[in-house]
Amino acid sequence: MASTALSSAIVSTSFLRRQQTPISLRSLPFANTQSLFGLKSSTARGGRVTAMATYKVKFITPEGEQEVECEEDVYVLDAAEEAGLDLPYSCRAGSCSSCAGKVVSGSIDQSDQSFLDDEQMSEGYVLTCVAYPTSDVVIETHKEEAIM
């Protein structure tokens, strides 16, 4: 009687390198996917990527007109400074009038400010240091004397 032994072969794949394929925007090799696609990544929301609105903000200054792009969650003064504009400001908290401007067209959210009264806001005055764009907007700058 002949007996045969069956042997089983064990193959280990632990030595093989696993290549990952990009599965999220963060894993793409671009330096700044936010500016590339107009997206914002937030780790506070579990790493989700959300679309952010970007608006054109035109500043009418004593030196002329200049236009910058501003995301909906960025103060217009900050966007102006990032673009190299030199606009007046002092407190950066919406509690003085150094950065005052006047909205010519468009709309802004300045709910963070505590200086302007309802009448001044209804006339279009804005504190650029605490104003978010909610549409494309045109703002005349250097209006501190007009509200005093």
Curated annotation (Swiss-Prot):
Source organism: Arabidopsis thaliana (Mouse-ear cress)
Chain positions recorded as [2Fe-2S] cluster binding sites: 91, 96, 99, 129
Reported cofactor(s): [2Fe-2S] cluster
GO molecular function terms listed in the Swiss-Prot or TrEMBL record: 2 iron, 2 sulfur cluster binding; electron transfer activity; metal ion binding
Domain 2Fe-2S ferredoxin-type, first and last residues per copy: 55-145
Domain of life: Eukaryota
Name assigned to this protein: Ferredoxin-1, chloroplastic
NCBIfam families: fdx_plant (TIGR02008)
Subcellular location: Plastid, Chloroplast
Primary subcellular site in the record, as a coarse category: plastid
Alphabetized CDD domains for the sequence: fer2 (cd00207)
Tissues in which the protein is found: Expressed in leaves. Not detected in roots.
GO biological process: electron transport chain
Co-factor binding comment: Binds 1 [2Fe-2S] cluster.
